[in-house]
Amino acid sequence: MERVVLLLAMISLVKSDQICIGYHANNSTEQVDTIMEKNVTVTHAQDILEKTHNGKLCSLNGVKPLILRDCSVAGWLLGNPMCDEFLTVPEWSYIVEKDNPINGLCYPG
């Protein structure tokens, strides 16, 4: 009996050190677009992007924003060569992306 308990304890330790990443089954109909996929169903979503703008881009605590011009965030992060100029920016307070930037995931734009 002691061996069975010890064996079960060892199995539970082995399984508890694994992290599995995947989609959760839920009844949500909320879908979002990620960098790599479109229409991914999520359990909880909150839109945190600003929809209006007053035309001013301010520094926050003296740190300027990163204005991506014709690059998308995905193109910048995933290595579109047209976005290489932004790789050397040491810091930024927030990121500014145009609505439909020319240089996205595909190269050339």
Swiss-Prot record:
<dbReference type="GO" id="GO:0046789">
    <property type="term" value="F:host cell surface receptor binding"/>
</dbReference>
<dbReference type="GO" id="GO:0055036">
    <property type="term" value="C:virion membrane"/>
</dbReference>
<comment type="function">
    <text>Binds to sialic acid-containing receptors on the cell surface, bringing about the attachment of the virus particle to the cell. This attachment induces virion internalization of about two third of the virus particles through clathrin-dependent endocytosis and about one third through a clathrin- and caveolin-independent pathway. Plays a major role in the determination of host range restriction and virulence. Class I viral fusion protein.</text>
</comment>
<keyword id="KW-1161">Viral attachment to host cell</keyword>
<keyword id="KW-1032">Host cell membrane</keyword>
<dbReference type="GO" id="GO:0019031">
    <property type="term" value="C:viral envelope"/>
</dbReference>
<feature type="disulfide bond">
    <location>
        <begin position="71"/>
        <end position="83"/>
    </location>
</feature>
<comment type="similarity">
    <text>Belongs to the influenza viruses hemagglutinin family.</text>
</comment>
<keyword id="KW-0472">Membrane</keyword>
<protein>
    <recommendedName>
        <fullName>Hemagglutinin</fullName>
    </recommendedName>
</protein>
<keyword id="KW-1162">Viral penetration into host cytoplasm</keyword>
<dbReference type="InterPro" id="IPR008980">
    <property type="entry name" value="Capsid_hemagglutn"/>
</dbReference>
<dbReference type="GO" id="GO:0075512">
    <property type="term" value="P:clathrin-dependent endocytosis of virus by host cell"/>
</dbReference>
<keyword id="KW-0812">Transmembrane</keyword>
<keyword id="KW-1170">Fusion of virus membrane with host endosomal membrane</keyword>
<dbReference type="InterPro" id="IPR000149">
    <property type="entry name" value="Hemagglutn_influenz_A"/>
</dbReference>
<keyword id="KW-0325">Glycoprotein</keyword>
<dbReference type="GO" id="GO:0019062">
    <property type="term" value="P:virion attachment to host cell"/>
</dbReference>
<keyword id="KW-0945">Host-virus interaction</keyword>
<feature type="glycosylation site" description="N-linked (GlcNAc...) asparagine; by host">
    <location>
        <position position="27"/>
    </location>
</feature>
<keyword id="KW-1015">Disulfide bond</keyword>
<keyword id="KW-0449">Lipoprotein</keyword>
<comment type="subunit">
    <text>Homotrimer of disulfide-linked HA1-HA2.</text>
</comment>
<dbReference type="InterPro" id="IPR001364">
    <property type="entry name" value="Hemagglutn_influenz_A/B"/>
</dbReference>
<keyword id="KW-0946">Virion</keyword>
<keyword id="KW-1164">Virus endocytosis by host</keyword>
<dbReference type="Pfam" id="PF00509">
    <property type="entry name" value="Hemagglutinin"/>
</dbReference>
<dbReference type="GO" id="GO:0019064">
    <property type="term" value="P:fusion of virus membrane with host plasma membrane"/>
</dbReference>
<keyword id="KW-0348">Hemagglutinin</keyword>
<keyword id="KW-1167">Clathrin- and caveolin-independent endocytosis of virus by host</keyword>
<keyword id="KW-0732">Signal</keyword>
<keyword id="KW-1160">Virus entry into host cell</keyword>
<feature type="signal peptide">
    <location>
        <begin position="1"/>
        <end position="16"/>
    </location>
</feature>
<keyword id="KW-1168">Fusion of virus membrane with host membrane</keyword>
<dbReference type="GO" id="GO:0016020">
    <property type="term" value="C:membrane"/>
</dbReference>
<keyword id="KW-1165">Clathrin-mediated endocytosis of virus by host</keyword>
<keyword id="KW-0564">Palmitate</keyword>
<dbReference type="GO" id="GO:0020002">
    <property type="term" value="C:host cell plasma membrane"/>
</dbReference>
<dbReference type="InterPro" id="IPR013828">
    <property type="entry name" value="Hemagglutn_HA1_a/b_dom_sf"/>
</dbReference>
<keyword id="KW-0261">Viral envelope protein</keyword>
<feature type="glycosylation site" description="N-linked (GlcNAc...) asparagine; by host">
    <location>
        <position position="26"/>
    </location>
</feature>
<dbReference type="GO" id="GO:0039654">
    <property type="term" value="P:fusion of virus membrane with host endosome membrane"/>
</dbReference>
